[in-house]
Amino acid sequence: MIKNYGDRYHLIDKKALEDKKLDKDQLVEFVRTSGISDIGKNYNIVSIIGSQSTGKSTLLNQLFGTKFDVQNRQQSVGQTTVGIWLSKDVQNNVVVLDVEGSDSVERKSGENMVENQTALMALAMSHCFIINVFLNALGQHTSCQLSIIKIIMQQNLKLFQQDTVKHIIFVVRDWDEDANYEEASRRLNGYLLNIWNEIPKPDHYKETDFHQLFSVQVVTLVYYKMKKEFIEQTNDLHAKLSNQQDPNFIFKDFDYEKNVRWSDMPQYLSNIWEVISNNKDLNLPNEKILISNMRCQQIKLEALDGVKQLNEDLQNRVRTKLVDNFAQECQTIMNLAFKLYDKDARDYHIEVYKEKEKELKDELVNRFYTYFQKQTEQLKQHYMNTLTENLETLKRESIYNLPDKLNELDLFKLQFEEQLAKSVIQKGLWQEEDHIRYFRQQFDNQLKAFVEAQLATFKQQLDNIIKSECDKIVSSQVLNISSKFWQQIESDYYAMISEKYQKYEVLLTGLRVQQKQIEDYLNKFEEDSFHNLKQVIAVASGRFKDQLFQQFKAQFVRAPDGQPRNWQKLTEEEIFHCYTDARDKVFQLLDSLRIRKIKFIRQQVVLKKKAQTLIISSSQKVQYQISSDADSDDVVLNDVFYTQVKMQLAEDIDVQYQDAIQKHKQDFLQNIPKPFWFLLLFFMYDDVLRWMGNPLFLYPILIILCFVGFCIAIGLHSLPKLAFQWVFRTLNQAVIPIIFGGISKLKGS
């Protein structure tokens, strides 16, 4: 069965009525080949209904230049139009529907529902209805098609209330000059009003004026054989329906945006006819929204496909490197997608258009977000690598330059934020603040680790410096031990450590160390510094004996003017006086070092802790030992060490004294001839042997040897030596002068 005649199309035919669906493929072909698809949404649809064989098709052909089949009046009367035919005004954007006539003698009994379905289809499609009636039939209810309108109103009130206002034009045919126009208009409007009042309505529409849903006009046409008048009247009616410049144009306020584009009309009409033919409730806005959804979804996918290559290119680049102007490229892709979408989708339902546009944006944004995450990783990696390189360079810098350098490194965080801001298409869209916060934390952690490592290295260097300074302080006092030994060490230590403390505190603050950590660092600095001082003093205490001995020699061997003493010119009493005076001074200095302790205490001064030495005198010794922080390691010279030092010092001092005495007597002994000593040994050797055999001589010798061995065994090596020195010193002072004095007298006599 032929449906497509090129200039007209059989939209609803017997097959469509039987199958309850349209042949959408043929309709698509007709829309394409007839040029109707080119008019887009800027069109109006006009339908004509009326009794059969009343010249409806003829009237349409006269009005719009269409070529609907018309009845040959010389043949038998019958139905020409079956279902609904569709065509287009040859000059204007008006689509015309020729609807099957009512009161068909060919229609079988019980097919009124089919008539209603075709009328409802026309109503669903049309913006304006031309109801074709004859003047002599105004009193016939059926002839005026009012019964169909009643059924449509009664069953499909939602159709009117949801869509645009429908225009109804009653075309009264075969009008003559004797007819009363006002009476005809009143009667036709009265019929419609009666129908409106009779049909059931929702509560909120019970008081609604009929004219809020329908715009009704009555137009009269003379008998068609009065060609001149008939043509003039049909031209006027055509102008009302198609000429937007005509003052009586009935579609002046029409919203063309609500129209379905003719390219989508096949699907739209198929959906409508399926609903109508199955006697379902028809909801035109929903059908339009459905079509808009389908087309806008398709256009959205086409727009995404149109920017697919750009998306893939951006994705590939961001995987391998940092992309400059990332956000600008994303925006360019999005703008292009919107342009492609808007070009084909802007004529569809505005809400659907916006919804799909938002979906398009969301899909692109979601894709861009995956790229953004990779871009952010690249950005973080770039600045973290830059930070690492700069920190490697800073390792060679002085730590005192680090505070200023850290301020310079902070610029990297600002640069990261600026670059990240250039990578987002909308502030706050991709939670960039979280990325900034995480990067700052990662950046600060690496910076903190670097600072801690540098501080650890610096602390070792500082400890070495403190130890060296302490060694200088203590050594300067050890080289000249005085009664102010401890006071001077304390004073010099404080002067040195205070300067270092202040610099260290300023450095820690500049390196952004937290206040609690600063206190910990300073406490550790105080304790370690003081520990270094204690170690230096402990090591220096090993030189106390030698230094005191040197100071003894300086006082004993040299006169007050600094010149060496001439022992031969001094008497033994004078030598002994010099000896005891120098010895007592040295022992007094040694005694001042004997039980001194170094103790670490803190004093809260302007919220700063300081280390200081506490010199505890002999009277405080017991009190200190029972204190809670007493430590035996704090003692500089304990009792055993003190005894050893004093004995060794006394031994060395006595040797000096004996040496002085020997030098004093050196003249006298040198005057005795050497042969005399050989003769004395020769004549006395047998007496020596005899003495050795005498128990009174042997036993004392054995006792002395046992005493010496015992002292050596218990570690008192110097005790026998001191005893022998004392014995020989006594003999030297008492016996020898007597012997040599007698010899001198004999020589003198």
From Swiss-Prot:
Record: residues binding GTP = G50, S51, Q52, S53, T54, G55, K56, S57
Question: Which residue spans belong to the Lumenal compartment?
Answer: 693-695
Family per record = Belongs to the TRAFAC class dynamin-like GTPase superfamily. GB1/RHD3 GTPase family. RHD3 subfamily.
Q: Which organism is it from?
A: Paramecium tetraurelia
Q: Quote the cellular component terms of the Gene Ontology held in the record.
A: endoplasmic reticulum; endoplasmic reticulum membrane
Disulfide connectivity for this sequence is none
Subcellular localization, per the record?
Answer: Endoplasmic reticulum membrane
Q: What class of enzyme is it?
A: hydrolase
Coiled coil keyword on record: yes
The record lists the lineage as: Eukaryota, Sar, Alveolata, Ciliophora, Intramacronucleata
A single Gene Ontology biological process assigned to it is: endoplasmic reticulum membrane fusion
Q: Which GO terms describe its molecular function?
A: GTP binding; GTPase activity
Name-wise, this protein is Protein SEY1 homolog 2
Q: What does this protein do?
A: Probable GTP-binding protein that may be involved in cell development.
Enumerate the InterPro entries for this protein: G_GB1_RHD3_dom, P-loop_NTPase, RHD3/Sey1, Sey1/RHD3-like_3HB
Where are the annotated coiled coils located? 445-465
